[in-house]
């Protein structure tokens, strides 16, 4: 079952997200997600198997320019994760479908996402979910 996540699910979301975004901590993610949930332009979904959380997705509405799109707002997949041992069961596809339905309900005509250039698993997932590649970029920074 896929369902919308609520404030009571913040601990579950933060723990799942920390498995994907290992550069962050559960506490930081809990705080960030708590702040994000107060905004109406973002939604989290949880995937449950036998009432056990096994995955999540985070989607948003983007009003700024999104690479390769032509409309505003654009639904955007900010993150998607399914625990090892529960993968290849179609759960990520279910989570994505929930995000797409949410975005469509919010008036979006396009849905977009991104992934790190070396994340082959994510690239393959996006291709399998009928995303088309719109661009590749390299980001730069320097200290001032």
Explain the meaning of each model-derived region.
Residues 1-13:
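A short beta-loop-alpha structural element at the N-terminal edge
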Residues 25-48, 58:
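Active-site rim helix/loop that mediates acceptor-substrate recognition in acyltransferases
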Residues 14-28, 65:
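Helix-loop element at the rim of GNAT/NAT acetyltransferase active sites that forms part
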């Amino acid at each position: 079952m896929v369902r919308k996540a609520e404030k009571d699910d913040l601990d579950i979301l933060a723990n799942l997200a920390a498995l994907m975004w290992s550069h962050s901590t559960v506490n930081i993610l809990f705080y960030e997600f708590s702040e994000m949930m107060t905004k109406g332009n973002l939604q989290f979904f949880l995937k449950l198997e036998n009432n056990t959380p096994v995955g999540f997705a985070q989607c948003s509405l983007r009003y700024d320019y999104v690479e390769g799109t032509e409309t505003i707002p654009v639904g955007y997949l900010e993150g998607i994760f399914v625990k090892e041992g529960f993968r290849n069961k179609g759960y990520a596809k279910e989570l994505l479908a929930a995000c797409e339905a949410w975005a469509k309900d919010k008036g979006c005509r396009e849905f977009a996402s991104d992934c790190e250039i070396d994340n082959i698993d994510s690239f393959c997932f996006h291709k399998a979910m009928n995303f088309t590649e719109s661009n590749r970029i390299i980001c730069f920074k320097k200290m001032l």
